[in-house]
């Protein structure tokens, strides 16, 4: 636009110069040529500048990002961020699965152990308690806790002899023929007070009655004590005679 205006102006000046002078003097012709050359040079320079400006403007326009491209780039960025967040959530979920599984296994194992212990206790409670003597087989269970560990230790043999005699005794009252064995057992207990302490013979006799037959009521304490003492006196009387 600028080059076109400048070219028109230079042509107008040249025409006026030619029309105002009637004769083609050499000096005027030289001046006209110079003016034409100068105008042409200026026009060419203006065209070159204008072309360069358009080139720079086009390159800048091409480099500029359109709104559509900007929106697409933002959408891509959001999609990448979303994918990254989803991956992190999946990773954290996978990392917590083993811990949750371990905790669940521990709870189930504890519940199974508790159920097993409860079943064992119920089975023990449902089983009838057995004494030291089984009247059906006629056997004595020396390991029965009801004997209080008397069958073991330094006086275990004396205890077994007295208890066996009492169990199989058919005398009346029962066990009166085992007084001597009870006396030997009691003397052994007295020799080991650190183990047996003060043992009551009458208490042992009552325990024997209870172990033989739970349905059979033990004799009265006074009556049994009198019979035991009488049996001791009868046993000791021949030894004291001259």
From Swiss-Prot:
Keywords on record: Disulfide bond, Membrane, Mitochondrion, Mitochondrion inner membrane, Oxidoreductase, Protein transport, Redox-active center, Signal-anchor, Transit peptide, Translocation, Transmembrane, Transmembrane helix, Transport
Cofactor binding note from Swiss-Prot or TrEMBL: Cu(2+) or Zn(2+).
UniProt-listed Gene3D superfamilies: 1.10.287.2900
Keyword Disulfide bond on entry: yes
Main location: mitochondrion
Mitochondrial matrix side: 19-34
Record remark: domains: The CHCH domain contains a conserved twin Cys-X(9)-Cys motif which is required for import and stability of MIA40 in mitochondria.
Any one of the GO BP annotations: protein import into mitochondrial intermembrane space
Region Disordered, residue ranges: 1-30, 58-111, 215-242
Organism placement in taxonomy: Eukaryota, Fungi, Dikarya, Basidiomycota, Agaricomycotina
Top-level taxon in the UniProt lineage: Eukaryota
Protein name as it appears in the record: Mitochondrial intermembrane space import and assembly protein 40
Subcellular location: Mitochondrion inner membrane
Annotated organelle transit peptide span: 1-18
GO molecular function, one term: protein-disulfide reductase activity
Transmembrane residue ranges: 35-51
Disulfide bonds: 144-146, 155-188, 165-178
Membrane recorded as keyword: yes
Motif (Cx9C motif 1): 155-165
Role this protein plays: Required for the import and folding of small cysteine-containing proteins (small Tim) in the mitochondrial intermembrane space (IMS). Forms a redox cycle with ERV1 that involves a disulfide relay system. Precursor proteins to be imported into the IMS are translocated in their reduced form into the mitochondria. The oxidized form of MIA40 forms a transient intermolecular disulfide bridge with the reduced precursor protein, resulting in oxidation of the precursor protein that now contains an intramolecular disulfide bond and is able to undergo folding in the IMS.
Basic and acidic residues: bias regions: 76-90, 224-235
GO CC aspect terms: mitochondrial inner membrane; mitochondrial intermembrane space
Its membrane topology: Single-pass type II membrane protein
Sequence ranges on the Mitochondrial intermembrane membrane side: 52-242
InterPro entries listed in its UniProt record: CHCH, CHCHD4
Motif segment (Cx9C motif 2): 178-188
Pfam family, one: CHCH
């Amino acid at each position: 636009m600028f080059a076109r205006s400048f070219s028109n102006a230079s042509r107008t000046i040249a025409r006026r110069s030619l029309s105002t002078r009637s004769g083609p003097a050499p000096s005027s012709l030289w001046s006209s040529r110079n003016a034409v050359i100068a105008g042409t040079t200026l026009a060419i320079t203006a065209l070159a500048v204008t072309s360069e400006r358009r080139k720079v403007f086009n390159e800048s326009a091409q480099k500029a990002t359109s709104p559509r491209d900007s929106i697409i780039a933002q959408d891509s960025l959001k999609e990448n961020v979303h994918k990254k967040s989803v991956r992190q959530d999946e990773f954290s979920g996978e990392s917590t699965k083993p811990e949750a599984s371990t905790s669940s296994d521990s709870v189930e194992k504890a519940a199974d152990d508790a159920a097993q212990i409860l079943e064992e206790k119920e089975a023990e409670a449902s089983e009838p308690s057995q004494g030291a003597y089984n009247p059906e087989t006629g056997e004595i269970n020396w390991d029965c806790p009801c004997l209080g560990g008397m069958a073991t230790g330094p006086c275990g043999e004396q205890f077994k002899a007295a208890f066996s005699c009492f169990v199989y005794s058919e005398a009346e009252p029962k066990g009166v023929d085992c007084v001597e064995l009870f006396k030997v057992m009691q003397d052994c207990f007295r020799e080991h007070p650190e183990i047996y302490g003060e043992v009551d013979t009458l208490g042992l006799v009552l325990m024997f009655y209870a172990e033989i037959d739970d349905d059979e009521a033990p004799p009265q304490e006074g009556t049994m004590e009198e019979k035991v003492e009488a049996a001791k006196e009868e046993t000791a009387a021949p030894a004291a005679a001259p």
